[in-house]
């Protein structure tokens, strides 16, 4: 009797494992984003497409706290340069993406203690950020189909500077037609740190009860992700809003640059 019970438990565990695996490989688009910006200013993202139960496409990219376009765009344009013999970041990232498609499982990557790998030819960059996010993405629910026609990273910078010398920027990530991430920032006409970084350092201070600019801005970003359309952001005549808890900063400029960025996605 004990042997039969043990056998039944084993069968149940096997089928349970198969079931979990099947759920993890449901067809669809999967997304994950890092929790915070790194010391170099990057926050990484992973986008994985599953079709027929298999990973058919993987994208690794990064957004930044500098008010600039995504990492792949900057690397391809020569703005973000490593001068590595193996190629620039976007070239190496593509090899890592291809390896995930080959392996079909991010846990199968061989990652060293320094977050790099010797197992992928032509790759000298750290890859742990991607492998961790790929695991996280595949463990989450697929991204629901959204209203936008194109996926990708959409950036826009205001052509004008405000009275404080800042020009607002928006970098929006769209997956399966859905906004999954929004990044609001501003660059100064004199150069130097972005508004977000200045706020973090305490160089740009508001002394607001709701928090400094870098604290309030993510609340506005989260609202756009929730609403899915910058046109739905409620803005008063003074450029502020009463519709987002903990936000006293003006948001009109974000509404404008986000709408401009997303024109290319519609």
What spans do the regions from the language model cover?
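Positively charged n-region of N-terminal signal peptides that target proteins for export
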Residues: 1-8
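Bacterial N-terminal signal peptides
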Residues: 8-16
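Sec/Tat signal peptide C-region and signal peptidase I cleavage site
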Residues: 18-23
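Active-site- and interface-proximal helix/loop "cap" or "latch" segments in soluble metabolic
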Residues: 24-150, 157-266
């Amino acid at each position: 009797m004990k042997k039969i019970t043990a056998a039944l438990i084993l069968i149940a565990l096997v089928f349970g494992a198969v079931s979990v695996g099947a759920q993890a490989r449901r067809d669809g688009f999967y997304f994950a984003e890092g929790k915070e910006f790194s010391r170099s200013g990057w926050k990484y993202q992973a986008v994985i497409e599953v079709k027929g139960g298999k990973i058919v496409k993987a994208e690794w990219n990064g957004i930044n706290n500098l008010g600039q376009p995504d990492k792949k765009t900057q690397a391809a344009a020569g703005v973000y340069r490593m001068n590595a013999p193996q190629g620039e970041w976007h070239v190496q990232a593509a090899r890592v993406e291809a390896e995930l498609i080959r392996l079909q499982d991010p846990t199968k990557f061989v990652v060293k203690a320094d977050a790099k790998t010797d197992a992928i030819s032509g790759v000298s960059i750290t890859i742990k950020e991607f492998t961790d996010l790929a695991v996280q993405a595949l463990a989450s629910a697929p991204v629901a189909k959204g209203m936008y026609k194109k996926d990708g990273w959409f950036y826009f910078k205001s052509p004008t500077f405000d009275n404080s010398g800042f020009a607002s920027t928006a970098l929006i990530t769209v997956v399966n037609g859905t906004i999954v991430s929004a990044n609001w920032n501003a660059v100064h006409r004199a150069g130097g740190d972005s508004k977000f970084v200045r706020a973090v350092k305490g160089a740009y201070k508001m002394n607001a009860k709701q928090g400094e600019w870098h604290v309030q801005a993510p609340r506005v970003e989260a609202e756009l992700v929730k609403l899915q359309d910058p046109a739905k952001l409620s803005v008063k005549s003074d450029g502020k809003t009463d519709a987002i808890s903990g936000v006293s900063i003006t948001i009109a400029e974000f509404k404008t640059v986000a709408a401009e960025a997303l024109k290319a996605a519609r």
